[in-house]
Amino acid sequence: MKYHIEKNTVQETLVIPLYGRKMCSELYPNLFRDETAMRLIEEIDYDFSTFAKRSQSMMQQFGFLECAMRQSDLACEVRDYLRSHPNAAVVNLGCGLDATGHACDNGTCKIYNIDFPDVIAVRDALLPAGEREKNIPCNLNDTSWFSEIDASGGAMFFAAGVFYYFLTPQVKALVCAMAEAFPGGKLVFDAANRKAVKLMLKTWLKNAEIKDVGAYFAVTDARRELSAWSDRLRVSSRGYMLGYNDLRNQNVRKFFRFLSKVGDGMMNMQIVRLDFAKENKKQE
């Protein structure tokens, strides 16, 4: 029996990025392929006709490319960390129905997926935890989840499309707490400047009647802005769209490569990498 999801529910918010990853896989198979997303779409009882109609537009297809590159970039960072920390904890912050942990599984790492309880309930039904894996129902800002993570072999945290919905002080508090709790760990996530965040969250902000867009997390110069948060942070970043792949692929339109340059440049779309120092810089 298929898992039924009603429209205009919290569960529906999980379907949107899932459908995006499915379309990424179909349109750009040489760049990104999410077998789990493709399978889950077939197992969910939901009217995807509106999504299917929108998917024909050029800008929507560029949106799918954005999704593909974000997931591919973050997976690249996870795999890189696992090369030097094969027994590390791989932690998906705000996981939804994303299976990046599975895609990067090296056979020895430990996988953790964290999200709100109602989200984890859906995940448990559709993506039950496997071997060396744990689904944790918790608000990310409630740091009690720290105690659930076995970081004895290292800790690699990643968040895809999550921090745009956080206030800047919330991101700062969480990052600083993680740097203290997981020395030698690493956090990677996507970010963009204020103009881009306003465009991305336009509908959400309107529906939530939020007027102070400037309070939400945005980054222009990651190294300068985030290094000031803590002496334990080593900050670097790479372009979100072209920093890991030049997109010279037969499936990618030249116009999309142009838009990618605009995104990485004018919008400061980036993958931010925060390495947590093993010791406080002032002590080194």
Task: Name each model feature, range by range.
Residues 143-153:
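Short amphipathic alpha-helix with an adjacent loop that forms part of the alpha/beta core around
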Residues 198-213:
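Short, glycine-/aromatic-enriched active-site segment of Class I SAM-dependent methyltransferases
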Residues 181-194:
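Conserved beta-strand signature within the Rossmann-like core of class I S-adenosyl-L-methionine
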Residues 157-158:
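A conserved beta-strand element that flanks and buttresses the S-adenosyl-L-methionine
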Residues 165-178:
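A short, conserved alpha-helix within the catalytic core of class I
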Residues 232-258:
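Conserved catalytic loop of SAM-dependent methyltransferase domains
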Residues 1-91, 95-138, 151-152:
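Rossmann-like AdoMet
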Residues 213-240:
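Short alpha-helix
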